[in-house]
Amino acid sequence: LAQLGAGGAVCFASGFAEAAGEDASGSDLQARLVAAAGDMPILGPNCYGFINALDGALLWPDQHGCKRVDRGVAILTQSSNIAINLTMQQRALPIAYTVTCGNMAQTSQASIAQALLDDPRVTAIGLHIEGFGDLRAWEALARTAYDRGVPLVALKSGASDHAKSAAISH
């Protein structure tokens, strides 16, 4: 896709670094994916992609409960299962974006959240975080969100050894 000039891609497939405990070649496969992508941004692997309910665009392989909205919250999580469940909420929370980032082989959760802040129709960002990578990127995100008056709501999971193991393998 990168050679064809695609603007980006979503890798829905699993069996990459998240499966390294069962298949040692998963990490190598993920490295080859990143190398093949080059400068082309990719979400995933091991994710459901994204739903843009503002513009009616999505790369999402399953059912969801999002409806078109003019403005609303962005939800960003590594977990596709959590994302699906959140889109099915019936509380009339206007969801502008739902983005799953899976393994974050190339594009980090903090950088995706920074990009979501660039849309003035986003009123808040909800983050389900399984692990922090570059802390400076998270600090920059918090600073940008504060400066723009966009609340960040973060739920950090995977603190215990058992939870960390589950977060890595799910």
Where do the PLM segments sit?
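Catalytic-core regions of core metabolic enzymes
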Residues: 1-170
